[in-house]
């Protein structure tokens, strides 16, 4: 494939400035506030965890299964998926829950739709959706990695795929919320600190990305895609509020996971001192998905390691507010843009 080129009018966006105090507390956080010890029995509850074949997704699936939940491990099928499920079953032999592989390829929107339709054909309840899966293609310096629909790989897999999957599951989530205890049906959007370190000033991520992304490094593209997840999590809280569904964008922390598998040796060595075991990322995901300290009033709030509400960069907060509220309304506009990109599959 020919290396990607930006159109002549494209230019790199201005990034906002993350306060040092914010960066420090997210890179070197206090001890976890929510662990396996805090989790209730989840018998009868059903969850989907995307990207469950390794790392944080696998750990989160294990923890939910250990509390007797039925967990749909949404991931690309194959030997790796089967091995991940077998590993969890061996680790938790006494669980009365269930593990089910749900084939999901976020790089193909038609496959995303098929996965959602398969789940809905099997289940009438869904108590939590954890959009954990993501890709970081650090060796794609020429911008040649694309999805089946031709989108740049980071925005396609990390932003549009999860968005479509969530929209297609809204009905079953809403139906479950109508029967469940208030504030217990939730969606978790796994973002990263890249939202604050790289995200566009006042916007996080915008539709302009489709023009300027060839000007950015693969690491920057990844960070910007995570800003997209933050926008989705914040806006979803508003759009789904009437359904009784809570939504939380999170920074799972800097973790030892396969997310960095594309990075070179020096890159991995540089990160080693600040990387934590995958279980710590699961603690953040499960705090967002299960903690009884969270309620409707918190929906849409930024959650950071290892399970804390924390203020997002102030200029980004403006994106979550309408003009009438003193903001710029960008989160709403970005949601509408995402809908436009996936409308053929809704």
UniProtKB/Swiss-Prot annotation:
Instruction: Report the leader peptide range.
Output: none
Its EC number is 1.1.1.-
Q: Which residues form the active site?
A: 191, 222, 226
Molecular function as annotated in GO: oxidoreductase activity
> Is this entry keyworded Transferase?
no
Protein family:
Belongs to the short-chain dehydrogenases/reductases (SDR) family.
Q: Please state what the protein is called.
A: Short-chain dehydrogenase/reductase bet4
Species this chain originates from:
Neocamarosporium betae (Beet black rot fungus)
Q: What is the lineage of its organism?
A: Eukaryota, Fungi, Dikarya, Ascomycota, Pezizomycotina
> Gene symbol?
bet4
